[in-house]
């Protein structure tokens, strides 16, 4: 068995109901993950690779755009997905994820990952990392706040909806970030 043995871990129809289906697959190789798209989008692809190399140096191992498709090889991040049932969803765990996402927003601003599902958060003891950066781009503050709240509710239930817009904890953070990065 060599490094090229793989198995398909996800297949997604990107735009269902269109003339032809745009499909993205994710393969788990022994040495890396590969996302493959059966279509091309150079306007997304090249800036996306550049952004990832800036925000997460070394995460992209290889990438290629052809006439018929595109693919990106990603470094394997050690640890378990936060969605793993071994993690107890107690207040300490919820607080740890909440604090990590806010820290990530601060770290990557003006970009925002915006796919903070537990399945995209990898925990390895005290280290926490994000995977699946496809939605990451420069975002408006309102969008970051809305997606943050939607993610926390999806991850932990409606009791974890955040505060009203006027006193949302991300507002002062985002305002401060936008002022310091001018």
Each predicted region: which residue ranges?
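Short, glycine/acidic-enriched loop or turn micro-motifs at the edges of active sites
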Residues: 78, 118, 135-137
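Short beta-strand micro-motifs within the conserved protein kinase catalytic domain, predominantly
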Residues: 61-71
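ATP-binding glycine-rich loop module of kinase domains
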Residues: 9-51
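Short pocket-lining segment of the protein kinase catalytic domain that shapes the ATP-binding cleft
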Residues: 72-80
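Conserved kinase catalytic-core helix
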Residues: 46-60, 80-124, 128
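Hydrophobic residues embedded in beta-strands of well-ordered beta-sheets
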Residues: 70-72, 127-128
